[in-house]
């Protein structure tokens, strides 16, 4: 910031330094020079002022909201306490009916989607995910076949071992 380029045209560029006027106190002059070197530019100043104004507005709105909530609670607390034996059971029944209705609708949609998928799968239309079901079925069949072969192989082995242990059997 202390250096500025001067010159016009293709000639040599010279740099001039901005010198501060000497003050009477050496330490005070040094402090002022440091402060002047760190002065924010206009963009930073406008950003800071915007932040300050926005923060003040939000703080004011927060105070108004908290105050109105407290005043509303103070004014309506007796009314809420006096009428609670009437509206608490009504709200509970309404909540349970709404939850039951929405659960029934959700289960109905899930059953309809599952039934549609199963119908498409069994009719051979190959719905989304049928390849995975076919793969799982083939894996289960392969595993059952291996278990069956293993049982045949080692089942005969165990029967011969039993005959060795009890020759008359």
From Swiss-Prot:
A motif (Proline-knot) lies at residues 78-89. It holds the Pfam family Oleosin. Expressed in pollen (at protein level). Residues 1-25 are annotated as: Disordered. Its main location: other. The chain crosses the membrane at residues 45-65, 75-95, 99-119. It is found in: Lipid droplet; Membrane. The keyword Membrane applies. One of its GO terms (biological process) is pollen maturation. It is a multi-pass membrane protein. The modification N-acetylalanine is found at residue 2. Keywords: Acetylation, Lipid droplet, Membrane, Transmembrane, Transmembrane helix. GO terms for cellular component: membrane; monolayer-surrounded lipid storage body. Belongs to the oleosin family. The proline-knot motif may be involved in the targeting to oil bodies. This is Oleosin. It comes from Lilium longiflorum.
């Amino acid at each position: 910031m202390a250096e500025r380029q001067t010159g016009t045209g293709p000639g040599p560029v010279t740099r001039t330094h901005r010198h501060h006027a000497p003050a009477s106190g050496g330490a005070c002059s040094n402090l002022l020079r440091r402060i002047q070197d760190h002065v924010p530019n206009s963009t930073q100043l406008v950003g800071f002022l915007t932040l300050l104004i926005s923060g003040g507005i939000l703080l004011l709105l927060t105070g108004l909201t908290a105050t109105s909530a407290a005043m509303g609670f103070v004014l309506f607390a007796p009314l809420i306490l006096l009428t609670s034996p009437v509206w608490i059971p009504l709200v509970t029944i309404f909540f349970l009916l709404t939850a039951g209705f929405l659960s029934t609708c959700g289960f109905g949609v899930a059953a309809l989607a599952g039934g549609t998928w199963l119908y498409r799968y069994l009719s051979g239309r190959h719905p989304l995910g049928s390849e995975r079901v076919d793969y799982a079925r083939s894996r289960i069949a392969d595993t059952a076949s291996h278990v069956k072969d293993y049982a045949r192989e080692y089942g005969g082995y165990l029967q011969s071992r039993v005959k060795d242990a009890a020759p008359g059997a």
